[in-house]
From Swiss-Prot:
PREY and PIGY, 2 apparently unrelated proteins, are respectively the product of an upstream and a downstream ORF contained in a single bicistronic transcript. GO terms for cellular component: endoplasmic reticulum membrane; mitochondrion. The keyword Zinc-finger does not apply. This is Protein preY, mitochondrial. Residues 14-49 are annotated as: Disordered. It is linked to An homozygous frameshift variant in the second exon of PYURF have been found in a patient with profound metabolic acidosis and clinical features including muscle hypotonia, failure to thrive, developmental delay, optic atrophy, persistently elevated lactate levels in the blood and cerebrospinal fluid, and abnormal cerebellar white matter and cerebellar atrophy on magnetic resonance imaging. Residues 51-97 form the TRM112 domain. Interacts (via TRM112 domain) with NDUFAF5; the interaction is direct and stabilizes NDUFAF5 protein. Interacts with COQ5; the interaction is direct, stabilizes COQ5 protein and associates PYURF with COQ enzyme complex. Residues 36-49 have a biased composition (Basic and acidic residues). The lineage of its organism: Eukaryota, Metazoa, Chordata, Craniata, Vertebrata. It comes from the Eukaryota.
Length: 114
C-alpha cells in the first residue's frame, strides 16, 4: 500500500513543473529514485587502473598477437603493427579505429628529415 502511494506521488510530481517539496524529495529518494537535483551531477570516483593480469587473455584484434602494457601512456601496445590501444577508466578500448599509430610511416620520416 505504501509503495503504491509512493508511485502515485512520484507520477504526480513528474507531471508538475514546480520543484518538489522536501517531503516529496525524501519520499522519492526512499523509493530508490534519485532526486532531480542529483541527476545531472557526476559522482567523483578515483580513476580505475588497468589490471595487468588481463594481458594473459587480451590479444590484438587485428593480428591476434599478445599486447604489452605501457603504464606511462596508459595504452596496450602491439609492437608488430606499431599501434597503441587506449585504456579509459581501466577498460582497454580495443576498437581498431580508436588505436593510434606508434611508428611513423617511411614517407613521413623522409619528409621530417628534410
Amino acid at each position: 500500500m505504501l509503495s503504491g502511494a509512493r508511485c502515485r506521488l512520484a507520477s504526480a510530481l513528474r507531471g508538475t513543473r514546480a520543484p518538489p517539496s522536501a517531503v516529496a524529495r525524501r519520499c522519492l529518494h526512499a523509493s530508490g529514485s534519485r532526486p532531480l537535483a542529483d541527476r545531472g551531477k557526476k559522482t567523483e570516483e578515483p580513476p580505475r587502473d588497468f589490471d595487468p593480469a588481463l594481458l594473459e587473455f587480451l590479444v590484438c584484434p587485428l593480428s591476434k598477437k599478445p599486447l604489452r602494457y605501457e603504464a606511462s601512456t596508459n595504452e596496450l601496445i602491439n609492437e608488430e603493427l606499431g599501434i597503441a590501444y587506449p585504456i579509459i577508466d581501466g577498460i582497454p578500448n580495443m576498437i581498431p579505429q580508436a588505436a593510434r599509430m606508434t611508428r611513423q610511416s617511411k614517407k613521413q620520416e623522409e619528409v621530417e628529415q628534410r
